Amino acid sequence: MQDAFSRMELLVGNTGVKKLSRAKIAVFGLGGAGSQVAESLARCGVGSLTLIDHEKITLTNIGSQVLALHSTLGMSKVEAAKKRIRDIDENILVHTYETFYNEETAGMFELRSFDYIVDTMGTLSSKLLLISRAREGRVPVISCLDIGDKIDPSRLEVADISRTTACPAARIIKKELRKQGIRKLKVLYSREQPAKEKLFRRRRTMVKKPAKGNISFVTGTAGYLLAGEVVRDILSAGNVSHS
């Protein structure tokens, strides 16, 4: 008898489907990559998703974020994601936190309750805190590094942070993690050289760029790659839902 995940079962088997259905995954950050991760995991039959983001959907999100539609403008990202995900799989458990992850809010989350953590947050201090807490709890974590100002999705790569190249964010994070004795971390990053041009032309005048640029096929590809890593790691691991 067919169900929503019958085609996936042909690929991963009944045991794989059961592993995913028991998995509890947290996604911190629902921007372009994070929102795609959450949706992709839902389409893989993951049993429980916890979504954390403090932002609301704006018009500028439409170009790069799967949650952003004219009908969702002004909605919190976590609520838009929950509604969309429950429309994909009505049986999935979705927990949402409309909050900014930092020292003040970190206590809200018992990280040991998760089988896997995905970090797609843009704030360096939040990333470092989450990575550190996840390591303390011995919870697998994958971190998406800076993919802004990139236009070539074929240059995206998953690697240990020690093997990254052409990524200024990786150098900073490596340095900070070493201070905590952390030398290994699975990350997604781009091998594309960062843009050197800090100015862009607007009405015949060179002005400083107000923010980093992004584009749908880079953020979307990043999300798919992250989700793929999570799913493959869960399938290759032992029992999940240890809590």
Each language-model region and where it sits:
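N-terminal charged helix/coil linker that caps or initiates catalytic domains
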Residues: M1-I25
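Glycine-rich phosphate/adenylate-binding loop
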Residues: S21, F109-Y116, M121-S126, E136, ...
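Conserved N-terminal Rossmann-fold NAD(P)-binding element of oxidoreductases
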Residues: V27-G29, I52
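Hydrophobic/small residue at the entry helix of a nucleotide-binding pocket
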Residues: A33
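Conserved S-adenosyl-L-methionine
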Residues: R43-S48, E136
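Glycine-rich phosphate-binding loop and adjoining beta1-alpha1-beta2 segment
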Residues: L51-I88
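Conserved SAM/SAH-binding loop
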Residues: E98-A106
